[in-house]
Curated annotation (Swiss-Prot):
This is Barrier-to-autointegration factor. Homodimer. Heterodimerizes with BANF2. Interacts with ANKLE2/LEM4, leading to decreased phosphorylation by VRK1 and promoting dephosphorylation by protein phosphatase 2A (PP2A). Binds non-specifically to double-stranded DNA, and is found as a hexamer or dodecamer upon DNA binding. Binds to LEM domain-containing nuclear proteins such as LEMD3/MAN1, TMPO/LAP2 and EMD (emerin). Interacts with ANKLE1 (via LEM domain); the interaction may favor BANF1 dimerization. Interacts with CRX and LMNA (lamin-A). Binds linker histone H1.1 and core histones H3. Interacts with LEMD2 (via LEM domain). (Microbial infection) Interacts with HIV-1 pre-integration complex in cytoplasm by binding to viral matrix protein and Gag polyprotein. The gene is BANF1. The modification Phosphoserine is found at residue 4. It comes from Homo sapiens (Human). The modification N-acetylmethionine is found at residue 1.
């Protein structure tokens, strides 16, 4: 699977206070929807990812239900968080 520059940039360093829109698969529209639901930072979405025990199906379904992410967007976001966890946790 090839990854986007956004994905590579995200997983290359600690998350810190990065905005939710810095996650691969999350653009301006989805980012705004997530922010409206309290998921304003990438680390808050990471928390949900971890609560769901890094389960791909559960996380992607949650992302779809929460902000309307399509299959590619949810797959990109999941892959980004999974790779970040592999590198930093």
């Amino acid at each position: 699977m090839t990854t986007s520059q956004k994905h590579r940039d995200f997983v290359a360093e600690p998350m810190g206070e990065k905005p939710v829109g810095s996650l691969a698969g999350i653009g301006e529209v989805l980012g705004k929807k997530l922010e409206e639901r309290g998921f304003d930072k990438a680390y808050v979405v990471l928390g949900q990812f971890l609560v769901l025990k890094k389960d791909e199906d559960l996380f992607r379904e949650w992302l779809k239900d929460t902000c309307g992410a399509n299959a590619k967007q949810s797959r990109d976001c999941f892959g980004c968080l999974r790779e970040w966890c592999d590198a930093f946790l």
